[in-house]
From Swiss-Prot:
The gene is ctpA. May undergo autocatalytic processing at the C-terminus (398-434 or 425-434 missing). GO terms for cellular component: extracellular region; outer membrane-bounded periplasmic space. It is found in: Secreted. One of its GO terms (biological process) is proteolysis. This is Carboxy-terminal-processing protease. Involved in protection of the bacterium from thermal and osmotic stresses. Coiled coil: none annotated. The active site is at S294 (charge relay system), D305 (charge relay system), K319 (charge relay system). It comes from Bartonella bacilliformis (strain ATCC 35685 / KC583 / Herrer 020/F12,63). Gene3D superfamilies: 2-enoyl-CoA Hydratase, Chain A, domain 1 (3.90.226.10), 2.30.42.10, 3.30.750.44. Residues 86-166 form the PDZ domain.
């Protein structure tokens, strides 16, 4: 009994010692941080007082902030008040510009996806293109926000993008006229006995537009004739998390849709489906490719894990991180990566992507042969390395032909839904566990 007490007391002293040590380490770390900040202040003062020309203090500070955020990952950034407003406008589905989703890679702007029916898409800008110049001026050394700011502008104004395209010997100058970009969140059509749903982007209107599209399809195809739906998420760069959750919920009656996990062990949020499948549990085939990112992967991953849909296409982009927009009042906003998201099976797709149940490659037209249209998170410099990421990486070709007749992936989906061909992965086995 005495020995037990002694051990207990020893444990208390040991714990107390560890607490003192931890406090000491914390204090030392804080002191070191303040020293580094003092060093920054010293350098800042020397630059503003000794540089050959008088610099703009605000630009110096903003660029320092951007440098700090860019050192974290490709998706964290600072936005001044004007850029924060532009970001809010884009999530509403309407803004002035070219209509391309871009990221930064090797000091160049890389096109993730041109949005359908926008000036950039009509002018021939392709996923995977690198923008090296804007109106003849090199953009190397600029931040992503600075380059995007130059590409946006009033409708009717011209802009010339100099494009470096893999497989093309010389840079291409593509002239584009800016327009008001009204992103139609959902496009749909009736294909005989099949409902085709294409989600362009996850904006504030995506779920409501999807509801309306499904309702209209159901009014045009009798229930006993409707074979199912094709949900096309190819070239969809993502968008709002809440819209991805609502869209997924439209096809489920129960179960987890997605979970997000932050830096702390208890920093976990789970989102579950509610009763009510809008498609009356009709068969669903989801199409993905290297241009399917973020919110698109949440939808595809959840429907795949719950065996609600069969996924066709090629490996998706692999962006499994969540960005939180932190308002800074009149000083703009901070776009900061705060969590990773996980599919219902507990899988993080960061740097991996969603693997289709049925891999179907889309052949490139002759003029693009030898051109690399592969997109993937794992290729981005400074990306957060996923726990399950391998040398294989993420992503695949990001190309969809304009003519549905040439769309091999889409036609594969139609044939499966109509029973013209069979595959073990369709329909998915609902009894198969994660």
């Amino acid at each position: 009994m005495i020995r037990k007490v002694i051990f207990f007391v020893a444990g208390v002293f040991l714990s107390a010692s560890l607490i003192v040590m931890a406090q000491s380490i914390t204090t030392n770390n804080e002191q070191n941080t303040y020293k580094q900040l003092a060093r920054f202040g010293d350098i800042f003062e020397r630059v503003r007082t000794q540089y050959v020309t008088i610099p703009d203090d605000q630009k110096l500070i903003e660029n320092a902030i951007n440098g700090m955020l860019l050192s974290l990952d490709p998706h964290s950034s600072y936005m001044d008040a004007e850029k924060a407003k532009d970001m809010r406008d884009s999530t509403k589905g309407e803004f002035g510009g070219l209509g391309i989703e871009v990221t930064m890679e090797n000091n160049l702007i890389k096109v993730v996806s041109p949005i359908d029916d926008t000036p950039a898409a009509k002018a021939g800008v392709l996923a995977g293109d690198f923008i090296s110049k804007i109106d003849g001026k090199q953009i190397s050394g600029q931040t992503l926000n600075e380059a995007v700011d130059q590409m946006r502008g009033p409708a009717g104004t011209p802009i010339t993008l100099t494009i470096n395209r893999f497989g093309v010997d010389k840079p291409l100058d593509i002239k584009i006229v800016r327009d008001i970009i009204k992103v139609k969140a959902v496009k749909y059509r009736v294909e005989g006995d099949i409902g085709y749903l294409r989600l362009i982007q996850f904006t504030e209107k995506t779920f409501s537009d999807l509801q309306a599209a499904i309702k209209d399809i159901q009014s045009k195809i009798p229930t006993d004739k409707l074979k199912g739906y094709v949900l096309d998420l190819r070239l969809n760069p993502g968008g709002l998390l809440d819209q991805a959750i609502s869209v997924t919920d439209a096809f489920l009656n129960k179960g987890e849709i997605v979970s997000t996990r932050g830096r702390k062990q208890n920093d976990v949020m789970r989102f579950d489906a509610k009763l009510g499948d809008l498609t009356d549990e009709k068969p669903i085939i989801v199409l993905i490719n290297g241009g399917s990112a973020s919110a698109s992967e949440i939808v595809a991953g959840a429907l795949q894990d719950h065996r609600r849909a069969t996924i066709i296409g090629t490996q998706s982009f692999g962006k499994g991180s969540v960005q939180t927009i932190i308002p800074l009042g009149e000083n703009g906003a901070l776009r900061l990566t705060t969590a990773l998201y996980y599919t219902p099976s507990g899988t993080s797709i960061q740097g991996i992507g969603i693997t289709p149940d049925i891999v179907v490659e889309q052949p490139l037209p002759e003029k693009y042969k030898g051109y690399d249209v592969t997109l993937g998170e794992s290729e981005l410099r400074g990306h957060i390395k996923g726990k399950q990421e391998s040398d294989k990486g993420s992503g695949s070709a990001a190309f969809v032909p304009r003519d549905p007749k040439d769309d091999v992936q889409l036609n594969e989906a139609y044939k499966l839904l109509r029973g013209e061909i069979t595959h073990a992965a369709f329909p998915p086995d609902p009894n198969k566990v994660f």
